Structures are given as C-alpha cells and as structure tokens.
Amino acid sequence: MAYFMIRRLNFNRYNYCSWRRCLNFLYLWGVIIEGAVVHEKIMRTILLLMAVAFCCVGQNAVAMVDTLRVCQYDSVQLTQDTTDILCGEGDSSWYGGQLGLVLSGGGARGLAHIGVLRALDEMGVRPDYITGTSMGAVIGGLYAMGYTGEQISQLNREADWNELLSRTIDMRKVAFDQKSSFSRSVFSIGLRGKRFRFKLGYIEGQNLWDFFFRLTWPAVKVQRFDSLAIPFRCCAGDVLRGECCVLDSGSLAVAMRASMSVPGVFTPVVTRDRRVYVDGGVCDNLPIDAALAMGADRVIGVNVSTQNAYEYNPTFGLRRILNNSAMYFGIRKAQEDLQRCDVAIEPNLEGMTSSTFSSGREIEQRGYLAALAQREEIMRLAQRMGRKVGVGAPCGFDTRRLLDSVAIDSIVVELESLPLRRFALNASQLKAPSKITQANMQRASDNLIGSGYFTHCIYYVDEQRRLHLLPQPAPRFVMSFAANVNDAWGASAIVRMRMLNPFSNVSRLDVAAMVTAQPKLDASYTTYVSPRMKAFVRFDLDYTSEKLPYYVNNQNVASVWKHGVGAQGFIGYMPMLSLTMDLGARYSFVSQVPNKEYNTWVGLKSLGKYRQQSLRLFFDVRCNTLTRPYFPERGQSVVASVAYLFNSPLQSYSSAGKEEAKQKVQSDLDKPHQFYSINFRYRGTFSLWSAVYLEPSLVLGLNSRTTGRFSSYLIGGGCFTVRDEFSDVPFYGIGYRQLSASDVWGAAFDARIRLWKELFFVTRVNYAQLNDTMAGLFRSFTNPKVGLLGGGAAVAWMTPLGPMAVSASLANQAQKVWFNFSLGYTF
C-alpha cells in the first residue's frame, strides 16, 4: 500500500539518481510494512515521515512548462539522463517508478496499437503515462480517457474509415439551398486576404472532426490532459514556427486531430494563438522524450512506422516519395528513440501501408500477436516495477457517458467579425443557460457547416461553464472547377463562383457556367431574413441554349435549337436542413430555331424562328435526405410542385411553307395559353446488405391541357443527363429525349452492387405511360397511348473527376440497344 501511494508522485527527471536511491529505500520499507501487522497509528506516522522526506529531496525539482497547449522540454538533457540511468543500474532487479507507453504514428498501420492495448489489458499492465503521435495520438487519447483496448477494437470494427477520411461530408448536413452545388467540383481555390489560394489540404476532414468530438464528449470540460484517467501527451509540428510541440491541454479532440494532420492530405489545425499544426510525424514520430518529461522511468514503445520505410521495391512511387520526404526526420528520430525503450514492440506489418484502412482488423491482430510475442519481457518489466500483473482487463469505459449532458451558463463565439458572431450564434440554435448533450453540439455544428459560411467548428466548455464555439470561417470568395463529357451534349467545362455577404450581411451570391456547345448560365442571390436562417429570399437569372432532338424510326434526324432566358424570385422556408418550401414566380422568354433537316421533314421551305413568353406561379416542397449527391448509401429525395402558367401566343417568323407544315410546327413548339401542372419526383436508396443498395424511383407529370412536342416532358437518356429538373425524364432503353408527352407517370427500380470501393454494377428496370391529356392518363392505365418497358445495366465508378457510367439498355418501343456514356460532375 505504501509503495502504490508513493509511485503516483511526480519524479524530478533532472535529479533522477537521488530519486532512484530514495525510491528503492522507500520501496523496501513499503514491502516490509505491507508484510507486517502494524498498528494503524504507526502506519500513518511512517507514511507521514516518508512524505516529508520526499518533499525535502525534491525542493529543487524543475516544473514542467504548462502554458497554453504546448509543453516544452530539453530533449538532449532527457536523453543523457536516461542513458546514464540505464547504463548505471545494470541488471538491478528492482526498478520501481512510473511506466510510460509511447505509440508511434503510421496512418492505417497505427491500428496495430489497438491490438497492443488489448494484449496489455489481458496482462493487467496499465501504464502511468501515454504519449502518441498521429494515429498513436488518436488511439492513445481514447485509452487515456478510459476506453479499454477491446472497446477501441469495437470502434475500429464499426468505423467506416473510407467515409471518415473522405473529402466529402454527409449531404444531410448541408442546407437545402446549397445541396444543388454541393460536392460537384474537382478542385477549388479561395480568396484569402488579397490572393487566391488553394486549400491547405486535400481533405478538410469534417467527418473526422465529428468522430473525435463524439468519442471525446465526456472529456469536453477537461482542459488539462493530466486530468484524464491516464495523463496524456501528443505531438504536432508547428509549421510556422518550425517547432515540435507537445500538446498537454485544451480540447482533446482538437489535439488528436492536430497530431494526425498529414501535410497535403489533411488541412492543418489553426489555433487561436496563430499556431498551425501538422502531423507530429514530421518531427517526432515516437515521442519518448515527452513520456520521460512527464515522469516515466521505464518505457514501452510501439513503433509501426519505420519497418521497411526506406527499402526499395518495384512499387515505389510518387506517393511514397512524398510521404517519406515529409516524414523523413520523424521516422529517422523514431528509429533512434526505439533503442531507448525498455520494451520495443514492432508488429510485422509487411504488405500494409499507411492508407490500407480496409485491412484494419488484420493490422490490429498483428499488433496483438506482436505484443503477445513479448509477453514475458513485458511481464518481467512490470513485475520489476512492483506491478500486480495478470489480473485481467480493467473495467470498461461506461459508454453511457457519451449521452451525458453538460450545464453551461453562457456561450462565447470566438470570431472577430461581430455580424459573423451573431450569425454563428443564431445558426447554432443553442441557448444558455441550459444543459447540452453531444447530440445538441452535433446539430449545432451541422447547422454552422451546412450554412456554407464555415468549414468546421471546434468547441469546449471551460471551468466557468462557458461554452466556447470556434467556427472556422470559409473563404469569402471561392471558385471551383469541374468537367463533363457525355453522349447527350458532348464535352463541357463547369465553373462555379460563390461570394459570401456581397451586398449585405448574411447573404450569398452564386454563379455557375457550363461552357460547351450547349451552354448554361445560372446566377442567384440569396439573403436570409430570419435570425436562424430558416426564411430566405432568392432571386435567379439563367440562360440556356440546347438542342432538342427530332427522332424518326429511332434515328436522330433533325433538331430544334432552343434559347431561353429566365428570371425568378421566391420566398423560401427551411424548417430543417433537408426540407424547404418555396413560393414564387418565374418569367421566361424562349426562342426556338429549327434546323434545315427539321424543315425538310415537316415541309417548310425556309428557315424561321419561333418565340414565346411565359409566366409561371409555383409552390414547391422539396425534401432531400440522401447522404451523397452521387451513389448515396441511404436517404430519400422528394420533389412536389404545383404551378399555374400563362403563355403568350407563339410568334412565327417563318416566311414560306405549306399551311399544314406551319400547323405541324405549332403543334411541336407551341404551349397552351393558360394551364396548370402538377409534378412529383421520388427517389430512395435503401441498403440491403453492406454492398447492395435498392433504389426505387417514381415520376408523375400532369398538365391540364395538351402541350407541344418540345414544350412538354421529354423522355429518354442514360445516367447523369438531366438538364431540366421537371421536363427531363430519364429512361433506360430509348435515346436521349426521344419521346415526349403532355402527361407521364413512370417507375424505376435499380439494384446497385458495390464491386470495389467506389466501383458499382447497376441494373435497372423502368416502366412509363405517356398520354396527351391528364384525363387520358388516368383512364388508360390498362391501355395507354404509349406504354414503355425497358431496362439495362451499367458499370459506374466515382472517379476523382466525378461519376462515370457506361450503360447498355433496351426497350419495347425502340427495338435497338442503346449505349450511353457519361463522365464528370453534372451542372
């Protein structure tokens, strides 16, 4: 009992020899006392004298610098002290003292640390201090909180690392008015200061932020890592100051994220004191010095980074060159530091790289086997330190604490701009004083990020019960770029621009242009009129130029060029991120120009132009809970619209031709003067198994009067060829926009199978009924004017350039196999 009270005191590493003699002396007394039957008063007296002796010896102890989040230490002095001790004591049977556990970085290879922790739990060996870098910081931080090795193993089995480490976030967290442009670019540049700059990393890592904040929620009020179940430190590199920093306080989630910010891959973590942290592996990949500075006397080191790091192999490529260059100093230092460990564990990770998270379970098992292989050495070290080993795993972390509520008295938003502070506070929808849970904070973070004004949000609760929100503002001006090529309209380049607060606070200007033979241009201005961003007013301007195909016997023989200019304004209300209701009006001016081939088919002798104006009053309800814009894993999308249209008469500028030919043109191009329409679209994605998804969809389009051939619903086309939300109805088995109808209803059923990561095999069966009138559509379910049944198969792949799909399809009306190809993000 005496010994176990003493060993929790902090040792002065700079007077280590004196401490060692005193410790051995006191330990012997502790053993004698524990083995004897002594009166309680005598025991108290002896312990008091021992404590006084300790205080006298340690008067000159050097205190550890503990300001901010960075702990400094003299690495050279610690190295010399450790060398003297290890060499001077020889084979001493008694060590005593504190045990440190040091976990290296290594990306996915770092999952081997979980297996090591499981083995240590089984042996009953519990460290007094933990330090880690990169993935070692993540796993070590969770273990320091109180998670057991088995619980962390469970997290590893349940975690979707591909999603956590992806550059896209769950689309359900994006405000509805921004979903249409969300995650549709290959790269982007932002205006920071007065210069355009690329992002500081390929992955913002918001999914990882959310993951860390959720798991560390019980420690949200912890400001010093010494207050954790096991004192903890992690390393990160400050690229501005050129320093290797040991993080010992602040937000545990932020420290873990900072320590694994691989340069170029993850964006660095920028703190309030203007420090810019990157992966600690660039400077100290095996932080043994940090463990010694905390007071560790003996160290168990687990290294997963240096094995075969600099051995040549035929697959050596650019990626490995960049990784080894960035981590060169840290890896070299880790090789040297490994020799200073009392027990060094190096799992056999041959064939595993820093990115093979798909093999997480195997990597973990290799770490477990490596620790078991050194079981005797670990147990011997623990016994020499006076540990009771072999008592089994510790009590598990109570996961119910993840649901704990925390009382707050006030909310502090740490932003320089007063309007932005108010906006962030309102958007978070948090109130104080109140009790908050992690779910409340997750929802607040989603609201802030989904607004588009912030890239991520850090938070913590201080000792005065103040909730601090540190949202990272997004660049005020961003340009993003993408490309697209398909068989419907050819190749195109897509440029998007977004400006925040261009004319007033809490507003946004979006401009998107598709540069192609059939161009499109959209510009919208949105301003929020409610404190919590639920109500907004939006104005749109758009231009489109497209070719409407004219088919005869399944052949595209002619076309009509359609040029349109439109303007609309509406009031929107978003009760939640995935739902919006819009009420507004739209004006459009359309000019249609048939080509020579079209005039030949209908009997006109000269070219002509046909113009028409229209006014549309509409009310739309939209809901979208899909997880991704392309190949989602779950969710549903619903669009319901009711509209009333007023059209001007079709103005003809054709100079010659038979009267019946002009009538044909009018029936193709004209719209009725007044009518109403109802549109409904549904799409769902349901996960049947881990790699199989079922996707039913429905479409319903009704007009109260018969419309022209090119003024109604256009049916046909493969994947990703929709240019107009309501008029285009994709259908497997016929050509792009091959058929048209005044009214249509249809259903499709897709089965999507994940073959490998983002590679899918898709099969589709679809059916549609087409009619000229709304009444005719309802009366002709058994005998429609046109009944289409088709289907096909496609291979789809989510590439860095956007979704790619190659499909083949057939329908009962077409009597031919249609092949379609598409690559790139859609407009």
Predicted regions and their residues:
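Buried hydrophobic packing residues in well-ordered domains
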Residues: 106, 136, 152, 242, ...
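Acidic/histidine-enriched alpha-helical segments
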Residues: 309, 379-397, 514, 635-638, ...
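Gram-negative/organellar outer-membrane beta-barrel architecture
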Residues: 438-439, 458-626, 630, 719-729, ...
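Patatin-like phospholipase
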Residues: 60-133, 141-446, 450-465, 474-475
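Flexible glycine-/small-residue-rich
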Residues: 236-238, 347, 413-417, 471-475, ...
